[in-house]
Amino acid sequence: MSRIEAVFFDCDGTLVDSEVICSRAYVTMFQEFGITLDPEEVFKRFKGVKLYEIIDIVSLEHGVTLAKTEAEHVYRAEVARLFDSELEAIEGAGALLSAITAPMCVVSNGPNNKMQHSMGKLICCTTSRINCSAATIFSAGSQTRR
């Protein structure tokens, strides 16, 4: 059997229980622009989908054009507010991280600041040894598209 060289974790829904919170933030964001969505449907349809793709889909379905950067600002502010008050580590995540001896990192499609926020909450809720420096967080959202 080969030695494990590193362990990569997705953050949302794996280390922190953020997916329902993010769905609620989508609902709030769209309400700001006069679009009412069912939170449960948002969770089922858009779990793991990138923010701008969600904005495109909902805009098309509702026959509107939303300014993505303005909508993103509303969404990010609501996510930060909800994370501060409600975000919790997934049960057992801290113990799992503490038990792993291989190097670890966190990967995500979200922006680095969201991951820093999530990981900060995880560290506050656990005694894990994961290092939350920029070197251990890899964000596809921060990469430029070609």
Predicted regions and their residues:
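Short, acidic loop-to-helix structural element flanking the phosphoryl-transfer center
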Residues: 3, 81-106, 112-116
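Conserved H-loop
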Residues: 36, 65, 125-129
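Helix-loop "lid/cap" segments that line or gate small-molecule binding pockets
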Residues: 29-30, 50-65, 118
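Substrate-recognition "cap/lid" segment bordering the active-site pocket of phosphatases
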Residues: 105, 111-146
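Metal-dependent phosphoesterase signature
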Residues: 58-95
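Short beta->alpha linker loops
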Residues: 21, 46, 50, 74, ...
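Active-site neighborhood of HAD-like aspartate-dependent phosphohydrolases
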Residues: 1-44
